[in-house]
């Protein structure tokens, strides 16, 4: 992702992101959990469900996160667990953009549960299967000097991690 590249290029000292595979130069420390949910437009056949198995969504067009998003990798793994991949109608990088396309009726989507969803014309459905856990990580470049202010901030984040 752009954030990980920014760490490697020393543009950033710290990034908050999803875990990325094959990044041996980056130290990932879990700092928070986030729930993922399925959102569907009002009037969708799945609208009345309180929870769902993701394999029951495969027949419907999905709005996906772009491949540059760390979240796309996480969601693709969920679909791999349920044995299939949905048809991707559109892909976007921003979660609110994905939710906006769902609200406009362009498809359904797996997104982070976020307060803004309650103000959008979508129905939120808990994902029952497959089981999963999404963690946010504090990412830093390994084996480089970090100023005392950076070390203090890292300690503060770890002391207040929401796990």
Where are these regions (language model features)?
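Residues embedded in well-ordered beta-strands
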Residues: 37-39, 45, 108, 135-139
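Secondary-structure junction motif
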Residues: 47, 61-82, 146-154
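Short secondary-structure boundary segments
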Residues: 19-20, 42, 112-115
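Flexible hinge/capping segments at coil-to-helix
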Residues: 23-36, 40-62, 147-148
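A late-sequence structural motif
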Residues: 124-163
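Short beta-strand-to-loop elements that line the ligand-binding cleft
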Residues: 18-19, 85-94
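Thr-Gly-centered strand-to-loop micro-motif
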Residues: 41, 48, 65-66, 88, ...
